[in-house]
Amino acid sequence: MQIYQEMSSPEHYIRANELLTMEWDDFDDYYRKYGSENNPEAYALRCSMWYRLNGVGLLVKADLLDVDRVYDLIGGTILSQWAKWRDIIIWIREEWSIPGYLEGFEFIADEMVKESESRGYAADVPESLHRYVPKEKGGT
């Protein structure tokens, strides 16, 4: 329940929104804007979210949390954060040779996709979720 309380706080939503609205053109641009040396605040914000969701995934994997309850409580957060950060996390794994980096986060994201689909919902997160994308460019 402590995880839910933290992830339902106003501060969580401020942090989640800030993370989801970060933009970059490529990995160099990302690192220039948000890398730990250049922007320690963004680094701390990102790691706080990533490691929390990684922990949720590890708890589910160890059968200490129930997948459907996690989905009901924070499934949207998991899906949107993974959609935003997947490529960066995979790049970090490859660039720094740490293949298991945040595997709990990836695990729980995959489980949230399965749970969405089992309920008959789409699991895709639209690119326009946290920024305006005109309809002619694929927005809603």
Per-range role (PLM):
Residues 1-140:
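Amphipathic alpha-helical "stem/stalk" segments
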